[in-house]
Amino acid sequence: LHKAIRRQRQMCIRDRICTYIDSHFREEIHRDELAELVYLNTDYMSRMFKKEKGVSISNYILQKRVDEAKKLLCGSSIPINTVSLHIGYSNFSYFTKMFKENTGLTPLEYRRKFGEETHV
């Protein structure tokens, strides 16, 4: 019974963190503010999140940003530097590096390969 209660609590905490990140991923998010949100020690919260989601908090945020960038790159003609700013990266070079590490393509290459104009 105790394991079931603990598991339910961990799932609830994970869901609260994910909901917060999903709503605020365009902003700078710090682990300590997430820990305050769920009333946990920062390190414990990070370990628990990774155990529950299979990915670290920073990688979860990165994936949310990359997914949003993909949508914007494919579904609009918004300049790539504006896409970078929209998803929370003020440093365009860093955005390009993170995007390429995650997708294997630069944002421009991704747009050329998967953008709307290539499917017309």
Predicted segments with their positions:
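Single conserved hydrophobic/aromatic residue that forms the stacking wall/gate
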Residues: 1-13
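Residues within helix-turn-helix
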Residues: 32, 43, 79-82, 92-93, ...
